[in-house]
């Protein structure tokens, strides 16, 4: 029994992999990216981030953005997934997690969304202690539910 988790780029890869294999019994996607089109120009990294990561923009080779978006493959996902996002994350916006969460629910996949108010992209490293504890509890409970 194997689970998968990742945050930020690892969250993107978690979203990606659940749409490409059913190998994992469960997943935890943290502060993730699901849609390169909607993410364009919204990150605090800078306007160049999408073009750098995908060699595409909404105006140039825009199909490539969709092909690289985990949301495109959400209809193939079967893995129960917990999404963890912070409301004040300006690197990987909450909407990215909500899109993937909603897509999984729409396609009948068990999913849970856990949002943290007053936290940002650094929740796991420098968030409020009570929120860091809750995050770890949510992850542990999810893995225990599906991996036992």
Which sequence ranges carry the predicted segments?
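Active-site-proximal cap/loop segments of hydrolase catalytic domains
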Residues: 1-148
């Amino acid at each position: 029994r194997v689970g998968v988790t990742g945050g930020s780029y690892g969250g993107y890869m978690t979203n990606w992999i659940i749409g490409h294999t059913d190998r994992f019994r469960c997943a935890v996607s943290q502060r993730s990216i699901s849609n390169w089109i909607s993410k364009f120009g919204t990150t605090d990294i800078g306007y160049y981030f999408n073009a750098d990561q995908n060699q595409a923009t909404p105006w140039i080779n825009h199909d490539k953005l969709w092909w690289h978006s985990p949301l495109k493959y959400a209809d193939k996902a079967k893995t129960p997934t917990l999404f963890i996002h912070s409301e004040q994350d300006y690197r990987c916006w909450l909407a990215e997690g909500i899109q993937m969460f909603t897509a999984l629910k729409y396609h009948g996949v068990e999913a849970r969304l856990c949002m943290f108010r007053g936290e940002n992209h650094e929740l796991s490293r420098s968030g409020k202690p009570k929120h860091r504890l809750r995050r770890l509890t949510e992850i542990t409970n999810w893995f225990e539910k599906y991996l036992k």
